[in-house]
Amino acid sequence: MKVAIVILNWNGKAMLQKYLPSVVRYSQDEAEIIVAHNASTDDSLQWLAKEFPKVRTIVLDQNYGFAGGYNKALKQVESEYYILLNNDVEVTHHWLTELIEEMDAKQTNAACQPKLLSVYNKDNFEYAGAAGGFLDKYGYPYCRGRIFENVEEDNGQYDTNSEIFWATGACLMIRSKDYW
């Protein structure tokens, strides 16, 4: 498929139970969904096989951490685009279409991310990445929608696409050719 959504999982059965249904519901027609098990010791692998048999699994022989786990898993995935998605992200209708359209339209972009809203208060941005990030003149990272520990309410102020310096790994779409 053109898009592979790869969810790195380590003992995250509860997160998969809560958030994977939205990924399957809103993505299965447009993407291959893959859960990469980073040496999980819970029964998330068995649960996944029973509840979502069409979701592909990659089983890693040890826990390689976040970056290492994704690197090992993505070597086993063939797709034009990768989406790295945390197992605690709930997606919504059309989320994937908009990302694909953005990347297809701007061939010079290596990656993009959507706005991320908090699962606890859907009117506020998510702390982990909000709406993309920048560096200030001192090299300190900050993101649209969050300054230090304070997150903004989403009032549509970041609905316009813009260039960012960094994107969060919580939900990152990247061209596979640029990843490697």
Task: Give names to the regions the model predicted.
Residues 22, 37-46, 62:
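A conserved acidic beta->alpha catalytic loop
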Residues 82:
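Short aromatic/hydrophobic "clamp" motif used to bind/position activated sugar donors
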Residues 90-140:
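Conserved donor NDP-sugar-binding/catalytic core segment of glycosyltransferases
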Residues 137-143, 148-174:
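A recurrent flexible, glycine/aromatic-enriched loop bordering the glycosyltransferase active site
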